[in-house]
């Protein structure tokens, strides 16, 4: 099968969040399974050119229709860790992708509307006819609209589109100028409730809604999140649209890259280990304490790794620090704040707890240190308010670090409470789950994890081993996406 991924990110060359990891991980898994995969990406000035091998201009004269004229583009070709990627660079006064950033510009809607148009124009002019076009998030939500409304009539009528939504919070909006620019000229037709018109603002077009309505299949990043966005508040206004298209909507759990996140081969940790040599985890725990100047005592280490913001349940992260100390545990935090007020709050906590031998707060992100924390900690907390999939808990399980999570989104699909999960046998349970957003709920789960570490170390070790036995690689998601591709090809 010939598959083209159209996305605004692909790790490690373009990475602002988890989207880049998913695009790369899925592409690699599909290639391992014997399929031809190519990626089409914007050529940002800030992307990591050192991660591209053999970059060269492959198509010098791509003219993309835009408003009443056309914008001249160059298309560069190169290999990103074995994946064949095409990077589109427009030559215009707008400098769409020479902004010193990936996102955050006032005209992001125009930037990515143009990218969607340019990606399809490139496929058309280069005579590429993939079986499947897989696009991601609002930035490429117009791809299926443009494909089936314009490019279908220029020889691209046999392609099928799978559209994956990673974050419903950011949907992409625009006015009629988007239609004029891209050639979708029938304004009353597209400003219709069943097409692109936003469900809240009748004067706005919604890119993500367009992707849902016009694509052949829609996925999000976990089965439980697929239910949340239809019937809860997490669809951010698109719940009814998703429900209407539920026959082509499914949650597919993301995977993690076990070539990177695997204690058996991890190059960032001093002592490698497996479930059979779990005693070596203690050596990494000592190395973590030595590096962070924690006192070397017989206590569990509780950790948090991730952003410090409301989505991640920052108030519960803060509470977990002091609750861990109260329960005679140590706490390690590695995170960066997205808001100035939260950053100042945790900077104050770092200063206040600076002389406490049982706490270390590291503000910012350090990939090497994150590996050591996963390998050295006993428990990891993921108290998210909103978590479409979540990778932290999957990595923790692989490293034998018991997750304590809030039962939301993909956390429900991956962590099963040791004491109370009614759907799993005791030998299939792998962590602790709480559901409410108050500190008492967090305590109900965190206390049980710490108490088990102290009172029943053999049972705690068994819980670690059970967690390490789960396979959250790209193996199963890759298989599921291939089933979706086959389904829409033969509809």
From Swiss-Prot:
Is-annotated flag, keyword Transferase?
yes
Q: What is its EC number?
A: 2.4.1.21
Q: Which pathway does it operate in?
A: Glycan biosynthesis; glycogen biosynthesis
**Catalytic EC class:** transferase
Report if keyword Mitochondrion is assigned: no
Any one Gene Ontology BP term? glycogen biosynthetic process
Task: Name the UniProt key words of this record, in alphabetical order.
Answer: Glycogen biosynthesis, Glycosyltransferase, Transferase
According to the UniProt entry, its GO molecular function terms are:
alpha-1,4-glucan glucosyltransferase (ADP-glucose donor) activity; alpha-1,4-glucan glucosyltransferase (UDP-glucose donor) activity
One family name in Pfam for this protein: Glycos_transf_1
InterPro entries from the UniProt entry = Glyco_trans_1, GS/SS, Starch_synth_cat_dom
**Which reactions does this protein catalyse?**
[(1->4)-alpha-D-glucosyl](n) + ADP-alpha-D-glucose = [(1->4)-alpha-D-glucosyl](n+1) + ADP + H(+)
Please give the family membership noted in the entry.
Belongs to the glycosyltransferase 1 family. Bacterial/plant glycogen synthase subfamily.
Under the heading HAMAP family, the entry gives:
Glycogen_synth
Function according to Swiss-Prot or TrEMBL:
Synthesizes alpha-1,4-glucan chains using ADP-glucose.
- Give the protein's recorded name: Glycogen synthase 1
Q: Which species is this record about? A: Synechococcus sp. (strain JA-2-3B'a(2-13))
Gene field: glgA1
